[in-house]
């Protein structure tokens, strides 16, 4: 990619549909006429991104300095999560407030060793900066492959190419063999996955309690929130003209929960509605050292019956970099999960509320998410009652 020390992966992608993840939801209000071109990221392929709207587009603006002074992404200290009922009750309340109002929060003192976090980021950077010939064997758009690498996963649906290369590792419930994982990532990927699964278990316990349910509810078979895990490494080269492209277009996540590790470059933004003028603005999510960023996905918003929020977010291109991040998606996986029915949870704190969504199988949800393409609406709108 341009701006990095490696050569671009100049391959012609096939048109096989990527079954996971489905295309991200993005705004269709300002579609450029430029047709995206695969892989090559020189300035001639860049188009004015649909995710940088004018002031007239949905009245969304970048957060101004005084707005940022009034708002920050919640940071939750998980120290003491396993000790004492009073501290745990405080943590449940903090998580509940974050997912109800913002949909995003960061966690510190989460128990994942700093060495594991830094080694995972370094491994992904090393892989992406290998010669194209070394990366070529992993190039795939086959959603059934447990290891795949490419640029622009929604290339044939998006109105503009994005400035990013991605390595997908589907690690659970059945992960790839060590030989399938690129050598640069092979040693650390399994250890990192194990740590993230443990952290995910803690988070789903807190979220279950935030719904007024027993702490194992979201992990149990009926919900299955912890069964599937995709570890997705993104590499964003420095862009010579960052105003002409996006690192990742605005979208929501087709997951139960996303746990993100990012380096210090920054660029992640979340769309948040400030109280004062009731207008949504893009707010920076800082690259807090040693922290994971956590956000609610569409599946969990449906299960929670709108008590938890899945919100739009994006990544800006930067003139510095590369930016490296690891997004860990807890999501449905496999044939058994495809037949599972997703429906609002109407027990616990939600017992008195009518359902806000129709029931649907996981397969129906994923197919709709993929087939609806980038029409500027949320997947959940189709199922809302």
Can you say where each PLM-predicted feature lies in the sequence?
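C-terminal flanking tails of non-heme Fe-dependent oxygenases
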Residues: 2-160, 164-166, 175-176, 181-385
């Amino acid at each position: 990619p341009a701006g990095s020390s490696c050569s671009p992966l100049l391959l012609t992608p096939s048109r096989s549909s990527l079954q996971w993840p489905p295309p991200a939801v993005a705004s269709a209000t300002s579609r450029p006429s430029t047709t995206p071109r695969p892989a090559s990221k020189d300035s001639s392929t860049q188009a004015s991104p649909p995710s940088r709207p004018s002031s007239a587009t949905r009245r969304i603006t970048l957060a101004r300095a005084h707005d940022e002074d009034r708002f920050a992404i919640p940071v939750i200290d998980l120290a003491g999560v396993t000790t004492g009922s009073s501290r745990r009750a405080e943590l449940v309340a903090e998580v509940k407030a974050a997912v109800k109002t913002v949909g995003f929060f960061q966690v510190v003192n989460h128990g994942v060793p700093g060495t594991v976090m830094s080694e995972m980021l370094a491994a992904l950077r090393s892989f992406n900066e290998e010669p194209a010939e070394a990366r070529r064997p992993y190039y795939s758009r086959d959603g059934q492959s447990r290891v795949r690498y490419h640029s622009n996963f929604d290339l044939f649906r998006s109105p503009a190419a994005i400035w990013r290369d991605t390595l997908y590792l589907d690690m659970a419930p059945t992960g790839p063999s060590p030989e399938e994982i690129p050598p640069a990532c092979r040693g650390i990927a399994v250890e990192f996955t194990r740590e993230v699964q443990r952290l995910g278990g803690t988070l789903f316990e807190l979220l279950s309690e935030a719904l007024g349910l027993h702490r194992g509810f979201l992990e149990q078979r009926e919900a299955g929130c912890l069964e599937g895990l995709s570890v997705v490494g993104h590499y964003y080269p420095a862009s010579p003209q960052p105003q002409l492209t996006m690192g990742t277009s605005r979208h929501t996540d087709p997951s139960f929960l996303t746990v993100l590790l990012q380096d210090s470059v920054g660029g992640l933004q979340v769309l948040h509605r400030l109280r004062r003028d009731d207008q949504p603005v893009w707010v920076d999510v800082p690259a807090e050292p040693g922290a994971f960023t956590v956000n609610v996905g569409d599946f969990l918003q449906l299960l929670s019956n709108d008590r938890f929020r899945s919100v739009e977010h994006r990544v800006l291109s930067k003139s510095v970099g590369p930016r490296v991040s690891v997004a860990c998606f807890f999501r449905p996986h496999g044939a058994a999960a495809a037949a599972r029915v997703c429906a609002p949870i109407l027990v616990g704190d939600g017992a008195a509320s009518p359902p806000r969504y129709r029931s649907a199988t996981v397969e129906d949800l994923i197919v709709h998410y993929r087939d609806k393409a980038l029409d500027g609406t949320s997947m959940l709108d189709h199922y809302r009652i």
